[in-house]
Amino acid sequence: MKYHIHKAVVIGSGTMGAAIAAHLANAGVPVTLLDILPKDAPPDDREARNKIVNDGWERCLKARPANLMSPELKTLVKLGNLEDDFGVVAEADWVCEAIVENLKIKQKLMARIDEVRKPNGIVSTNTSGIPVSAIAEGRSKEFRKHFLGTHFFNPPRYLKLLEIIPTKDTDKDSVEFFSWFGEYRLGKGVVLCKDTPNFIGNRVAFGTGAFAMDYILKNGYTVDEVDAITGPLIGRPKTATFRLIDLVGLDVWDHVGRNLAPLIPHDKLGQEYLKAEAPAKLMSTLLERKWLGNKTKVGFYKEVRGEDGKREFWSLDLNTLEHVPPTKLRFDSVKAAKDVEGLGDRLKVLLEADDKAANLVKALTYQSFQYASSIIPEVADTVKPIDDAVRWGFMHQAGPFETWDMLGVRETVKRMKAAGYPAARWVNEMLKAGIESFYQYQRSSPTDKRRAPRSGIADKNGEKVGVYDVVKGKYIKLRKPEGAILLKQQKVVSQNSGATIRDIGDGVACLEFHTKMNALDEDIMNMADEAFNRLETNFEGLVIGNEAENFSAGANLFMMVVGAQQGMWDMLDAAVRKLQNLNMRMRYSPKPIVVAPAGLALGGGCEITMHASRVVAAAETYIGLVELGAGVIPAGGGTKEMLRRTVNPFMRLENAEPLVTLQRAFLQMGQAKVATSAEEARGMNILTSADRIVLNRDHLLSEAKKEVLHMVASGYKPPAPEMIYAAGRDALAAIRIGAWMFQEGNYITQYDHHIAGKLAYVMCGGELTRGQWVSEAYILDLEREAILSLFGEERTQARMWNILQTGKPLRN
């Protein structure tokens, strides 16, 4: 390969630079982070000379959510300064500049890099507002061939968007390679951008955000009202509008908006709202007060302690500029829309209503369509880069044109015009030509009898195969993602309301869950049983995975708590046995079963993962045995499996004592600890060294299938049955004493202590007089006995109901 990236350098240790370096470490790329020398730094004091970069990296390590997927990854990051350590630039395969947004300073740095850059070494800038081509002015031809913009969104670990901006001089091979590197190594959604002001993501965000702020102030909306309306209800994150500005920082938001306005004199729609008087006056006042948002702990929201000592977030009164307690909001349109599942159908309910909330949704929706269409073909020739940038950069459920397709383009254009937000001319020309949608769609698998996915696009559920090209005036073919499997396009083998078995080709099947939060219920268990049966005769291997936000949030608590309160003990016993049996069947399957978790994999979802032949996990997998928070213990084989992984290896050593490793596993389950990444899950013995981690979620199922095929080709054999070391009553007594001390110190409640005692009993093998090796079935029986007894306790039932009603654990 002409290009590779084995070593990288990031210059600039501010918020973005340090976070980019951290994400390179997440991807396994050794990186050196450089910054300037402090003024008057002594020549022989390394610590003093590296103070700026050391401080920047320290802030990065302390940031929450964490920039690194595991603390151990920091060993991949070296620190230095631009005088003593500039030599590393000559060895780097990629140099990423993330310094102050000043053209002259950037150009001066590029001149230094040009002198030492290695042949085929790629150089990029993370600028968000300066023309990329201007930064490379005056540089050598070879430098300019290997120079481009790489605009990450903050924080780089969590936001998928990477805008790549080539100049007219950038070599095509450099662009293709870095696009591949961004997608496959860094796990990014890559959008190729023209070198236009603020590229695509921020151009759309500030063109629509400036309008939103002006409309909100003119029409007397409160901060609470706006954020209640403009979050998940309309397909946007919980940060909605004002929480997002607090997160970004009011100073950053204002700076980007002010810098954008003079760069787009031709953009009348953007100019009108970026220069609006009321928002400018508000922002100026808040900046004078140093109310910058989360970084100063006060902005549009302020954290206060209520009379009961609990945290509350008070919102800013936009008239008095004082923070006020939160208020409960009631809008008929919002109440009606909340009961509707699909985003398109939910928006239709809001757009057809006529109250204050509905009017805000109409204005924001129609203006976003108007503005996004107005900047084509300036920023892109098709709608897809804009949709991708909005989804990946701002975590919207759908981009503006995907949303427009949901609502029906022709009908929406009429409504927009009537509301005073006319669509761009090219949209009307498209409709005149008889083209009714921005995308061409291919129907889903005809054998799929399920309704549209909850997160899907209403009436447009097929795969996108084409997109309207504004310049050419016709659909052009969309490139099929090479590293992705789209389940809805795969043949359905069998299906019920909880799960589907699909044939994903090459002798591999996929078991897909699709209950709410993918909670494990009887339908999923039955379909899993069928999948294992079909695997024996019809397939070479099986993937268990899905395309939902979360792999599985665990067992169906509603079924469990209702069953307990109605005394349905046979049903509960059968349900627990079935999960245990399925997991054991999976562990000893003669054919490989690869589990592909992503998002939440909690409780039973974690237990399924731990019994796989192998795991191929998305990097952003949040996994753990959390049952104690619901008033029970892991009983689908999770307790048994944790003992096998933590205690067994240690007890095979000579003169080993089990207590230390046993206590570590006990605390992990007792505290219901959740790994904050797949990498961290490895350190918790939930994933093993043989399991794989995939940074790009879109590639997860494809990589899981590849793993199945590799295991088949390698002659996969299941593991031999294994005995479990049970430490006996002496270890049980020691753990019980530790739990009692936690209770006495008010770290846990009396009922926490009671549940912990049940867990300890199972982990130690009950009241065995001495430590001994026991069968897996012995521990599974203890798991089942413990959970059934806990189901019958009122305080466990109260914990379950609280999670169902509030989503939060109850400490009773």
Regions found by a protein language model. Give the residues of each.
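Short glycine/serine-rich donor-binding loops of glycosyltransferases
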Residues: 606
